[in-house]
């Protein structure tokens, strides 16, 4: 194999190694828990991941710190809870 072919192979292997962890990321286990809707402090708008819908949904969060399935924004919820194929 020529040196150009070896460099191409090395480049492709490096790219594959970099992309593999991103494409196989799984969601956090807390994303499967139901939203905590108890009122303990000030009620704020938050988002939780709804597994049956496979998306993030807005809800009223009462500040009780019940579980990790509450996020300040839809974007943060999606980053933490959506699976990547």
Swiss-Prot record:
Pfam families: Kunitz_BPTI. SUPFAM superfamilies: BPTI-like (SSF57362). Expressed by the venom gland. Its main location: secreted. Beta-bungarotoxin is a presynaptic neurotoxin of the venom. The B chain is homologous to venom basic protease inhibitors but has no protease inhibitor activity and is non-toxic. Belongs to the venom Kunitz-type family. This is Kunitz-type serine protease inhibitor homolog beta-bungarotoxin B2a chain. It comes from Bungarus candidus (Malayan krait).
């Amino acid at each position: 194999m020529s040196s150009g072919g070896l460099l191409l192979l090395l480049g492709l292997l490096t790219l594959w190694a970099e992309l593999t962890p991103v494409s196989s990321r799984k969601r956090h286990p807390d994303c499967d828990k139901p939203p905590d809707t108890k009122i303990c402090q000030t009620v704020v708008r938050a988002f939780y991941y709804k597994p049956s819908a496979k998306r993030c949904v807005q809800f009223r969060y009462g500040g009780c710190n019940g579980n990790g399935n509450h996020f300040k924004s839809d974007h943060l919820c999606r980053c933490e809870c959506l699976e990547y194929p």
